[in-house]
Amino acid sequence: MPRFGAHMSISGGVSKSFARGESVGLDSMQIFAKNERQWTAKPISPEEATAFRTEQQRTGIHPVVVHDSYLINLAAPADELREKSIAAFADELERCAQLDIPYLVTHPGAHTGIGEEAGLARVADAICRLLAEGVGGNTMILLETTAGQGTALGYRFEHLARLFELIPYHERLGICVDTCHIFAAGYDIRDPEGYQTTFAELDRLVGLTRVKCFHLNDSQKDLGSRVDRHAHIGQGCIGVEAFRMLVNDPRFADLPMIIETPKGEDMAEDRMNLALLRSLVQGAE
């Protein structure tokens, strides 16, 4: 069975995320390693890192996945923004290494007008620069599929394939597939034929063994809208059958499948979405 998870708050410190995750019954979890809307943050103290490991051992929640800051744009043509982005991304990698977190999820960035190929080249150059220096230890960077809003890169599987061509550090590079994003980008996974076609295409271009994580989100917007709006599982334009196929796909049997669906402070919606996903697993009681 996949390891079902959700994005949890780190309010009060990164270690506090585990108790929240435990309260909604998570197997795996996604967090921010710092405030996602600020460029810099105070370092994680050794005490906080120890508390994080202790809480992870206590709850058994694994793997933990970090999503990087929304401010980071490794494709940015403006040198000042790009250098700030690279420095911030390096900090994210080092925070992951400090907490023994295996995966850092990032959107490939937005080219803001310089063109897709030039944007992808800048992303690759930035990542190569950091990985050549060994930044982040063994933490793997997961390139996330995007909906393709504005000039965002990563909405075509060809973009991801190009980044794998340009970045030789494949042992530290993987993919995170977001169901809402690929659907908004035009990949129809609602029926068996479309589902198989989509993942055959991803396998041909990138390789399914490089998929290390899923973001399971339904979509408020229709197929090919290029608009990123998440919905509760089965309550959007994708519908429940795509998720039934995903959670029973033996190729993805042990992967973290993390919801990023709308929720309030009591996280009741997380419990609802996770219960639905678990009920779709064949043989689940």
From Swiss-Prot:
Residues that bind Zn(2+) 3: 181, 228, 230
CDD domains membership: AP2Ec
InterPro entries registered for this protein in UniProt: AP_endonuc_2, AP_endonuc_F2_Zn_BS, Xyl_isomerase-like_sf, Xyl_isomerase-like_TIM-brl
UniProt: Zn(2+) 1 binding residues: 67, 107, 144
Gene Ontology molecular function: deoxyribonuclease IV (phage-T4-induced) activity; DNA binding; DNA-(apurinic or apyrimidinic site) endonuclease activity; phosphoric diester hydrolase activity; zinc ion binding
Record has Ligase as a keyword: no
Top-rank taxon, per record: Bacteria
EC number(s) given by UniProt: 3.1.21.2
Gene3D superfamilies membership: Divalent-metal-dependent TIM barrel enzymes
Binding site for Zn(2+) 2: 144, 178, 215, 260
GO biological process, one term: base-excision repair
Cofactor notes: Binds 3 Zn(2+) ions.
Reaction catalysed by this enzyme: Endonucleolytic cleavage to 5'-phosphooligonucleotide end-products
Pfam families tied to this protein: AP_endonuc_2 (PF01261)
Top-rank EC class of the record's enzyme: hydrolase
Record's keyword terms, sorted: DNA damage, DNA repair, Endonuclease, Hydrolase, Metal-binding, Nuclease, Zinc
Cofactor: Zn(2+)
Summary of the function given for this chain in its UniProt record: Endonuclease IV plays a role in DNA repair. It cleaves phosphodiester bonds at apurinic or apyrimidinic (AP) sites, generating a 3'-hydroxyl group and a 5'-terminal sugar phosphate.
Sequence similarity: Belongs to the AP endonuclease 2 family.
Protein name: Probable endonuclease 4
Organism: Chloroflexus aurantiacus (strain ATCC 29366 / DSM 635 / J-10-fl)
Lineage of the species this protein comes from: Bacteria, Bacillati, Chloroflexota, Chloroflexia, Chloroflexales
